[in-house]
Amino acid sequence: QFSKAWSLAIIKSDNLEEMKICANTVNGLINFEMDLHIKLCKKYGISKKNLINAEERNKNIAYSRYVLESGYSGDFLDLITPLIPCVIGYAEIGNNLKNYKPSNQMYKSWIQTYSGEEYQKISKSVGRLFDSAILSRLGKNFYKTRKWKSIQKKFKTAVLLEIDFWEMALE
């Protein structure tokens, strides 16, 4: 679902640079991140077919549909705002865990992917995209606009939905 949202961001983009960043993000999600998850699942006995056909959990539906609906009903900022906590969050978690040496190597490849240079580069690029989109659409005094309050609310909601998404693993 997040690949679809980033694909929609290409359409909602105002310029070629935004389109490139969104397209690179889609490429990273589909051609690298999905491969990681498929390999991890296979390693632990979950086939690609079972993974692809798995029933989507309610918390995942809530988060991903919130993002998509934000994009369908709003503009570029409305769409990318709820995407940011996921991208930046994974980069931060990966970075914080990169020197962690657990006795159980179950998550080693996950940590290497999200702390790795490629994902960190994507994360920084997405952060710059967000900053640039805010300035180009709302101006230097963005924090005084009505839209800024909406962006803050969307971001906070997305963070809470991202937390719920992570908590699914504990259920």
Regions found by a protein language model. Name each.
Residues 19-125, 156, 160:
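Active-site-proximal alpha-helical scaffolds that flank and shape metal-associated catalytic sites
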Residues 8, 12-16, 43-47, 100, ...:
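Surface-exposed helix-capping loop/turn segments at secondary-structure junctions
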Residues 2-23, 71-72:
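Helix-loop segments that flank and shape redox-cofactor active sites
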Residues 67-69, 137-145:
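Short, charged/polar, low-complexity loop and linker segments
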Residues 145, 149-171:
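Acidic, carboxylate-rich catalytic segments that either coordinate divalent cations
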Residues 1-6, 89, 163-166:
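Hydrophobic/aromatic-rich, well-ordered segments within soluble, folded domains that form packed cores
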Residues 123-138:
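Short loop-to-alpha-helix "cap/lid" segments that border enzyme active sites
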Residues 5-9, 39, 93, 168-169:
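Amphipathic, soluble alpha-helical interaction motifs
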